[in-house]
């Protein structure tokens, strides 16, 4: 019983401030201010009003990165829709560095979107393109244009066309709560329900190709790990061991799954070959070992352990079993996520002498740590695959919500989501 209580207390502590999913991370503030840009309302050569405002979506994408500050429409002296209509003195007068124009033309039952991006200072066109899709794909086309523009101006691949997983919990009565696993655009738009249950769903994770997701479901009245195919909805139960089955994490090649089991007593980290279902135990310690996250080489595993008395982050060589402690700043560091360049570690952090749980990033070369969030009781950070943005769960007005933060700290906004408590965000990899 004492072991179960210890597990429960540690789990509650992690829920009060855990870190979830990540990828590449840029810890660079760059200029003192975001780059001013104007995304002019796109012209539309059609009779009906479009259901989505493309220029608004593109502007929000660029703003969310923390690199750009879109000019409010009311401050625009002119609103050209064609490249030939751009008057550079208008944009120099309002102080923007770049201006984007676009035009939407119906073509054979579809929409063709032509766009152009200009450097105001040099008065040169830096990007032009065309994309075609249906009315239902207006958001997809908007995210695509934002991706192309962001990469052209920064040299960093855009991540606005990615997706996000999250869990909602809507309580109707004391013993009646509905849990749903949702997949949406990265900004919370267009949510689609992948799974609905009367029992909790936790720890959703994308596979490296984004086609599968792993998660923990309590539908059998005990935690079990499932893998579900995003497109078809087909599910496979992966674990059915006694005790805790939790914290799944796909290996970089997608062929193995690390997770936590308490089948031998206390929680330990195991890895399963998904082809053969062969199981191997990785950790062997009297403490709680949990929340595995793979290094990109597939032979390094970061994890949380209280083997030093309080939750801290360690790394293990999967082949040799050698373990080293990674975090030393603060009295609580948990749920590690590694940047793609393996120079930065993202985690849930609590400073010595404080009670707040916040999201932080540690430079693994210099050792310094920086707090990224300005809220409390923060949980489950997940980083965009290009490292420019971070989404995490927190609580506002006694409700679970998701927050988007640019890594450079310039942008902090709540994301629109469904009713009820929203939790457990997980950012997708780049998708085809």
From Swiss-Prot:
GO biological process: cell division; protein import
InterPro entries assigned to the protein according to its UniProt record, in alphabetical order: 6-blade_b-propeller_TolB-like, PD40, Tol-Pal_TolB, TolB_N
Chief site of localization: periplasm
Keyword annotations: Cell cycle, Cell division, Periplasm, Signal
Signal peptide range: 1-21
Cell compartment(s), UniProt: Periplasm
Gene Ontology CC entries for this record: periplasmic space
Keyword Membrane assigned: no
PANTHER family in the cross-refs: PROTEIN TOLB (PTHR36842:SF1), PROTEIN TOLB HOMOLOG (PTHR36842)
Protein name (record): Tol-Pal system protein TolB
